[in-house]
Amino acid sequence: MNGRTREYLKGRFGDHYRRASLSPPPAANEREWGYITWGDGGTTMVRHHSYLDVTGGGDLGGFLAGERPRHVYFSAGRYDDPGASSMGQKGWRGSDLVFDLDADHLPGIDPSETSYAAMLEACKGALSRLLDLLVEDFGFEPLAVVFSGGRGYHVHVRRDDVLELDRTARREIVEYVLGEGLDFDDIVSTQAVAGSAGRSSPAQKRTLPDGGWAGRVRTRLTTLFDEVLTMEEAAALDRLREFDGIGEGKAKAALTAARNNREELTKGNVDVHPAVYSIARELFETVVEAESAPIDEPVTTDINRLIRLPGSLHGGTGLEVQHLDRDAIDAFDPLSDAVPETFVGNEIAIYTQEPTTVELRGESFRLSEGVSSVPEYVGVFAMARGYASKAGE
């Protein structure tokens, strides 16, 4: 990025902060603050500052309007002395539990081949799965959901009962959300019952409990058999034979078991027939792959992590880091809703070295090689991404 481009973006970021209304996170005085400047010698991180250090006793917006940083962060950690120059001197008191979703970590997404819009849409799907796991399985409410301004989302849990979790405990939560280390037999509840049922006495009844990963598999299994029980027999058998190791005989046995034991199946009993157990085991793999959330593990386990400030601008896109209400997530379009109003309504001249396409505010802009006049928000995005530089007016 050349000097003219840097100075232009720095100035316009400052204009944004003069207009913006920013609210610091809870316990702002207990957190470390940091920011990245628009320096010409690479990335320069300024950190180990307290809230008082950065604001000088004033407000956060005034500091940002004056400093005009490229990126702004605060710590998940809370400290006795957040401005101390080393982590050991800060006196750790606890940390928010933070989850990060980024398109780079989504399975099947290649950032070099996937459009920015498609990556963000895929990330929103992963966010929905993450929130379901956090709320339904852990009971983590309230949650703070934030669009990162880049290619993903952050979720903050600030309840008192998570603040003092150490890295090991946070890693266990990560593994659960990722579905790592899960085995089907671990989620099945085993109960001794009277009789032998063809096995050693007493027999064992294996059941998928309601809730958690077991509950998800149970729901999928019940849905499957509800589906096949409404089909013609030939179609139902074909559907069941789609599962590995289920041939004609086992498919018929599973279908018969489902007809005769529908109530038990609904209760999660996977021992109504060995074929049903085999199908449930395979569904487990499918459910974990489909309903886990590909979070970035180091973000959650790092109790000292710096995370982006809502209301600030992302220096790699020019988009706003935005707090989202849970009921607004489905309708949220980051390529429209996160475009700062500061950059709307003006045209600027930019120079593009290679042709590229930018999609913002519901429109697609084809930038040809050379100098062109574009809406400022398009130019800011292209310059921040490194696609273009500022041309002379």
UniProtKB/Swiss-Prot annotation:
| KW Iron-sulfur (keyword) present | no
BP terms from Gene Ontology: DNA replication, synthesis of primer
Q: Which GO terms describe its molecular function?
A: DNA-directed RNA polymerase activity; metal ion binding
The keyword Transferase is assigned to this record: yes
According to the UniProt record, one GO cellular component term is: primosome complex
As cofactor, the record names: Mg(2+); Mn(2+)
Active-site residues from the entry? D100, D102, D296
What Enzyme Commission number(s) does the record list for this chain? 2.7.7.-
Q: What are the record keywords, sorted?
A: DNA replication, DNA-directed RNA polymerase, Magnesium, Manganese, Metal-binding, Nucleotidyltransferase, Primosome, Transcription, Transferase
Question: What HAMAP family does this protein map onto?
Answer: DNA_primase_sml_arc
* Family affiliation: Belongs to the eukaryotic-type primase small subunit family.
The entry's function note states:
Catalytic subunit of DNA primase, an RNA polymerase that catalyzes the synthesis of short RNA molecules used as primers for DNA polymerase during DNA replication. The small subunit contains the primase catalytic core and has DNA synthesis activity on its own. Binding to the large subunit stabilizes and modulates the activity, increasing the rate of DNA synthesis while decreasing the length of the DNA fragments, and conferring RNA synthesis capability. The DNA polymerase activity may enable DNA primase to also catalyze primer extension after primer synthesis. May also play a role in DNA repair.
Instruction: Share what the entry says about its subunit structure, partners included.
Output: Heterodimer of a small subunit (PriS) and a large subunit (PriL).
Mind telling me what this protein is named? DNA primase small subunit PriS
Native organism: Natronomonas pharaonis (strain ATCC 35678 / DSM 2160 / CIP 103997 / JCM 8858 / NBRC 14720 / NCIMB 2260 / Gabara) (Halobacterium pharaonis)
The taxonomic lineage of its organism, from the top, reads: Archaea, Methanobacteriati, Methanobacteriota, Stenosarchaea group, Halobacteria
